[in-house]
Amino acid sequence: PMSRGLGDVYKRQVEQQATFEGFLRPDGRAGTRNYIGVLTSVNCSATVAKYIGAAFDKEGETDLGNLDGVVAFTHGTGCGMNQGNGLALLRRTMAGYAAHPNLAAVLVVGLGCEVNQIPDWLKEAGLEAGPQLRTMVIQESGGTRKTVERGVSMVREMIPDFKSIQRQTVPASHLTLGLECGGSDAYSGITANPSLGAAADLLVRHGGTAILSETPEIYGAEHLLTRRAVSEKVGRKIVDLIQWWD
């Protein structure tokens, strides 16, 4: 049946939208943090990225101003992999980090011989290198030590452009809440899940977004979500997905 709550569209919005103090980005989005990120195109450049990030961990050695820090984001793939769904997923994920509103700027570190080539990723993601997105390749920089040194230098060059960014009042519609089913114990079912559900409902009423991963976990409660669907079409997609799992 296709009638699992589809007629009750969830449209209750608040009159006065909540706000928070965030970092407004050039693309109009807002973040809750102000980091410089060090990304990797491949697992082989993970150590270099970690060393670059660690160079800024010692408090007081570098004037970061309003930057929250320099953090490395590494993963375990990108090297000898098939150019299929796995590579596409990796590139989408990298693009999401590169454009994340919590990152003022990013440095992307590659090895040089990996399947996930940085130029190909940039082109596919519609990104361009510039002041907010810089890249480097270990095999072109003279090895690990020289790449770390150059990477630290590049981040230091980036810091002055972003350490003076000020927090400003922005609407709660900029917020996205990410949810994942953790331990399936009594506490999650009795306290955590209902509490987070209420928080997600409240955020959505203020124009924000909530994302729940692990889709099968909503089995048996899909009618509660279809009632909140923005349209019947969206509600039907939820029902179709659950029926696919059946």
Predicted feature residues:
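Buried, small/hydrophobic-residue-enriched core segments of structured protein domains
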Residues: K11-W244
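Single conserved hydrophobic/aromatic residue that forms the stacking wall/gate
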Residues: P1-L6, Y10
